[in-house]
Amino acid sequence: MQRHMLKSKIHRAAVTHCELHYEGSCAIDEDLLEAANIVENERIDIWNINNGERFSTYAIKGERGSGMISLNGSAARRAQLGDLVIIAAFAMVEEAELQAGWKPKLVFIDEGNKIKGHRDHVPTQTWT
């Protein structure tokens, strides 16, 4: 059996560009792509923390070290500059891989879209 699992997540990225008349996609700083194990042309889901929008597109490389998160084409209508987004990619994973310890790559970034940490799991949510 295969399960559809979270593979990669870039958490709380700030949108730096919106290019309505670009061909489409989301350009992401190449450093962030590599850290999250997202490859060019891979399908990604984007969840806008500011307005609740959720949509899918594909990743393209943005300039390395730039902090770029550019929503292009129709995706540019789903966010404003400075909105915080979560970028996620999923994979089909065999049950045996899960049992062997398969883990996602979660990347946490700061206000300038620079990497501040990594994790391989989402902590158990508790009441506060």
Curated annotation (Swiss-Prot):
The modification Pyruvic acid (Ser) is found at S25. Binds 1 pyruvoyl group covalently per subunit. One of its GO terms (cellular component) is cytosol. The active site is at S25 (schiff-base intermediate with substrate), Y58 (proton donor). It holds the Pfam family Asp_decarbox. Pathway: Cofactor biosynthesis; (R)-pantothenate biosynthesis; beta-alanine from L-aspartate: step 1/1. GO terms for molecular function: aspartate 1-decarboxylase activity. It is an enzyme of class 4 (lyase). Is synthesized initially as an inactive proenzyme, which is activated by self-cleavage at a specific serine bond to produce a beta-subunit with a hydroxyl group at its C-terminus and an alpha-subunit with a pyruvoyl group at its N-terminus. CDD domains: Asp_decarbox. The keyword Heme does not apply. Its EC number is 4.1.1.11. Its main location: cytoplasm. Keywords: Autocatalytic cleavage, Cytoplasm, Decarboxylase, Lyase, Pantothenate biosynthesis, Pyruvate, Schiff base, Zymogen. Disulfide bonds: none annotated. Heterooctamer of four alpha and four beta subunits. Belongs to the PanD family. PANTHER family: ASPARTATE 1-DECARBOXYLASE (PTHR21012:SF0). Catalyzes the pyruvoyl-dependent decarboxylation of aspartate to produce beta-alanine. This is Aspartate 1-decarboxylase. It comes from Burkholderia multivorans (strain ATCC 17616 / 249). The gene is panD.
